[in-house]
Each structure stands twice: as structure tokens, then as C-alpha cells.
Design a protein with these regions (language model features):
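Extracytoplasmic
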Residues: 15-49, 142, 248-256, 369-370
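Extracytoplasmic gate region of multi-pass secondary transporters
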Residues: 34-38, 224-277, 366-379
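Central cavity-lining transmembrane alpha-helices of secondary-active solute carriers
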Residues: 57-72, 271-284, 451
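C-terminal ends and interior cores of transmembrane alpha-helices
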Residues: 88-116, 303-315
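Low-complexity, proline/glycine-enriched hydrophobic segments characteristic of transmembrane helices
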Residues: 106-111, 371-452, 484-492
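Helix-loop-helix hairpin linking two adjacent transmembrane segments in secondary transporters
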Residues: 151-152, 159-210
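Symmetry-related core transmembrane helices of the 12-TM Major Facilitator Superfamily/SLC fold
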Residues: 185-204, 446-467
Length: 492
């Protein structure tokens, strides 16, 4: 897949490509800023790591649901109308999120528990509405770009999704320069800048329909694609990808900040790995031309597993940077290349199959990734402190209990108390505070090591697919020939 010729089908293809790029960039900015201010929320409102994981998980869950719904209605409602809806949801999400502080302050003196719960609801539903806006954009721009550039899907979907790490970089820099100096509410508002830009770019140009819709493929025939075992396997793998990439991204600056003993350094490391992703995604075309999309996915998943394992064991700043580099390079091409593979191999599915991939990935990140990694941190840290210093654990444990799926109920460490310890210099901490901090740090390290098993499993799945396609003469793109019920998928 050469990137030398766009082979686009519309004269306004590049304007729509960059409008989609800005929409995904807006999602990345908002996601990054929220990740950077998790510590502020924990300290201000007394949330545990599991509480914070559930808040971030709510955002990713909403993201996933709307991608699925949006994919089903995109061609019927129209891409332009859906982008306007996304803009409205982004605006409302800011209003609800910003309401958390005044509501909390008005209640905390008379009802501390109620104030905490009210703040939690504001942040959760604000995140959920933010995710609805993100999901609506995602439901539109993925099939849009795959349609605009039918012979270069992997290359241009990677360029489209360079907007995500670009947004993470912008949001991370905002957090780095403003953390501890500017209220989190002001940081939250800044993601509206790219929102306004993509909204303006979407006014005017005509949006095409997907390849499947152009060939008159019915909804029933689109849905029949899900009977293919390979598509079901790819959906399962993409669910794992959502867990490891987005679930980890929602925690990574927090965890590495603790490892580096500097919240600001954790944010800078996050910005660094996101910058790598941003730059490398513009070069997916030449790489895929040499090793195929599945080869790229296998290498990426393998690097991701190695990077997370090393990151969980790193003890010096240099080792943390090296480990994060391996992880960052590994995850760079996974998400957009998975979307491209599904679009190339199952074109009759149209927006529905590519939307299902994005939706499943986001749902997995929201339901399992964010909460699961938060739970793992709480579980390991609380058990470590409980075993070594039971009385100290009783002093620092949260007032509330948390549960994740079928795993045991736990009482994590109180976010406000642990946050106060983190804010102190090492020399200012008491021996007891050092012990609590060590348990907190250990929980973060082990959570990263546990997560490394997910990309390792993904790498095995990609290897099996590579071996399968070798028996079929190699990986090849599929196109639609014919119209209506006569439409068939043919290898080109």
C-alpha cells in the first residue's frame, strides 16, 4: 500500500480527512487532560483509585456504545448531522463536569458523604457525555476515511488516528504547565478549541456513503458478515486492544509519575510516548507495504507486552524512558491498523463492521480496562500494606469498598490521604508515610505487569492469522463487485 497516490474518490477528501483528524484530536485532548487531573479529583473529593477508574471507565463505555449505535445509523442520518450532535454533546459534557466543584462545596459541610457522591455523579456523567461526543465522531470518521481512500485504507486510517496522540500531546502539555498552578476546571475547558475547529470544517462539504451502501448492500447482508469466524476473532482481539491501550493510557501518567516521584515527569513521559505515536502514524503506509498489516500488528503487540513488563520493573529514570519508548512504539499502529484490516477483509459490512470494532474496543476499555487496572492497583497496594502493617492499613484505608467483576471486594487506600503523602518530598515523610507510599507504588507497578499479559495474547492471535493467510497465498484486500443482493466480495 503505497502512500504516493491517495486514490481518493472525492474532490474534498482531504478536507474531510483533516476534519476527522481534528475531531479525534479533540477527543485526545479531553482524554489527556482528564488523565492529568485524576489526582486533583482524588485529592479534592477523596476518591479511591477504583472510584477514579470507574469515572474514566464510564467515559470509555459511553464512547463504545455510541460508536455501535452511530455505525448503524450513520448512512441513514447523515455524517454531517451526526457531527453537529457530537459538538453539542462535547459542550454539555463540560457544563456537567464543571458543576462538580460548586455542588460539592455546597454540601460538604453538612453531608460529606453525599457531597462526595454528588461530585462523583457529576464527573461520571460529564465523562459519559464527553464520550458520547467522541463516539459519534468515531462512528463517522472511520468509515468515512476508509471510503475516501479505498486503496490506501491502512495508511490514511493511521493518519486519521494520528489525531489521537496529537491530542494527547496537546492535553499533556496543558496539564504539565498548569498542574498545581491552574485549577483543573480551566484545564477542562481547553479541549473545546479543537471541537470548534472540527465543527467549522464539517460545515459545507458533502459526505459520501460507505462502499457497502454505494453498492446497495442491505443491512441484513451487512450483519451477515458477523457470522465469519475471522471477524469474531478480530473483535475479541480488538476488545483486548481497548483494554490495554486505552485502559493503560487512562492511568499511565499517574502510575509513572509515582515511579518517577514526580507527577510532572509522569505527564512529560506520557507526552513523549504520544509524540512518538503521532509521528510514526504518518508512516504506516511504507511499513505495511513491506511487512503486511498483520505483520505490523504482531510486531506492535509484542513490543507492547515487552514495554509494559519492563515499565513495571523499572527503577531508574532512564529505564522508565526506555521501557515507555518500547511500549509507545508497540501500541502506535495497533488501533487504526485493526480497523483497516476489518475494512479490507469485510467491505460488505460497511460502517457497521468497522464501527463494531471501535465500539467493542471502547466498551472493553471502559468496562474492563479503566476499572480493572484501578482495581488491580487497589488490590495489590491494600493487600501489601495490610500484610506488612495492619494497623497502618486501618488508618489509611478508604471508607468505602470496591468490587470488580467476580473478583474479591476490597477497601483500597484513601485517595486524599495517599495524595497528601505523594505531595510531600521524600525527606519530609514519616516512616509510616514511606511505607504507605511504597505500597501505593508497588500497586501501580504490578498493575502494569498484569496488563502485559493482554498484548502478549494479542501477539499470539496475530501470529496465528499470519500463518493462516500463508496457507491462503498471503494477505490480500477484498473489494465489492456487483450491487444489491448480487454484491459479492472479491480478492484484488
Amino acid at each position: 500500500m503505497s502512500n504516493g497516490n491517495s486514490n481518493s474518490i472525492a474532490p474534498n477528501a482531504y478536507r474531510l480527512l483533516w476534519a476527522g483528524f481534528m475531531a479525534i484530536l479533540a477527543a485526545g485532548v479531553g482524554f489527556s487532560i482528564r488523565g492529568g487531573i485524576l489526582g486533583d479529583w482524588g485529592t479534592q473529593f477523596g476518591f479511591t483509585q477504583s472510584d477514579l477508574g470507574n469515572i474514566t471507565g464510564g467515559g470509555l463505555t459511553g464512547f463504545g456504545i455510541i460508536i455501535l449505535v452511530g455505525a448503524l445509523i450513520a448512512d441513514k442520518v447523515g455524517y454531517g448531522k451526526l457531527m453537529i450532535f457530537a459538538f453539542i454533546m462535547h459542550f454539555l459534557s463540560a457544563v456537567v463536569t464543571l458543576a462538580a466543584t460548586p455542588i460539592y462545596n455546597s454540601m460538604v459541610a453538612s453531608n460529606p458523604v453525599g457531597a462526595k457522591n454528588a461530585a462523583y455523579e457529576c464527573l461520571f456523567w460529564g465523562m459519559f457525555m464527553f464520550a458520547i461526543g467522541n463516539g459519534t465522531c468515531e462512528a463517522v470518521v472511520n468509515p468515512l476515511v476508509a471510503t475516501l481512500f479505498p486503496k490506501n485504507k491502512t495508511h490514511y486510517l493511521n493518519i486519521l488516528h494520528a489525531g489521537w496522540p496529537g491530542g494527547l500531546v496537546a492535553g499533556g502539555l496543558v496539564s504539565y504547565f498548569m498542574v498545581g498552578k491552574v485549577r483543573w476546571e480551566i484545564q477542562m475547558c481547553l479541549f473545546m478549541i479543537p471541537v470548534v475547529v472540527y465543527g467549522a470544517m464539517c460545515l459545507g462539504p458533502k459526505f459520501p456513503k460507505s462502499e457497502a451502501s454505494q453498492h446497495g448492500v442491505s443491512y441484513f447482508d451487512m450483519l451477515k458478515e458477523f457470522a465469519a469466524p475471522m471477524l469474531l476473532l478480530l473483535l475479541c482481539v480488538h476488545a483486548m486492544l481497548g483494554y490495554v491501550e486505552l485502559g493503560t493510557d487512562s492511568w499511565i501518567s499517574n502510575i509513572t509519575g509515582n515511579i518517577l516521584a514526580s507527577r510532572e515527569h509522569g505527564l512529560l513521559l506520557f507526552v513523549y510516548t504520544s509524540t512518538l505515536m503521532f509521528a510514526l502514524r504518518f508512516f504506516a503506509g511504507p511499513i505495511v507495504h513491506r511487512i503486511s498489516p498483520l505483520g505490523l500488528l504482531f510486531v506492535g503487540a509484542t513490543c507492547g507486552a515487552i514495554g509494559l513488563t519492563l515499565l513495571g520493573s523499572a527503577t531508574t529514570g532512564m529505564l522508565v524512558v526506555i521501557s515507555a519508548t518500547i511500549y509507545g512504539v508497540g501500541k502506535t499502529f495497533l488501533w487504526p491498523t485493526m480497523l483497516a484490516v476489518v475494512s479490507e477483509r469485510f467491505p460488505k459490512g460497511g460502517a457497521i463492521t468497522i464501527g463494531a470494532m471501535g465500539g467493542v474496543g471502547m466498551l472493553s476499555a471502559g468496562l474492563f480496562g479503566g476499572p480493572g487496572i484501578g482495581y488491580n492497583q487497589d488490590y495489590v497496594a491494600s493487600n501489601d500494606l495490610k500484610q506488612k502493617a495492619p494497623a497502618l492499613y486501618d488508618q489509611y484505608k478508604s471508607e468505602t469498598k470496591n468490587k470488580f467483576l467476580v473478583f474479591p471486594e476490597i477497601q483500597g487506600l484513601n485517595g486524599t490521604k495517599v495524595g497528601n503523602i505523594r505531595a510531600k518530598a521524600e525527606s519530609e515523610r514519616t516512616p509510616e508515610e514511606r511505607q504507605v507510599h511504597e505500597a501505593d507504588l508497588y500497586g501501580g507497578r504490578m498493575a502494569l505487569k498484569m496488563t502485559a499479559a493482554v498484548p502478549a495474547t494479542m501477539a499470539l492471535a496475530y501470529l496465528l492469522l499470519i500463518l493462516y493467510f500463508k496457507t491462503q497465498g498471503g494477505y490480500k484486500q477484498v473489494h465489492i463487485a456487483g450491487t444489491g443482493h448480487e454484491a459479492k466480495e472479491v480478492v484484488t
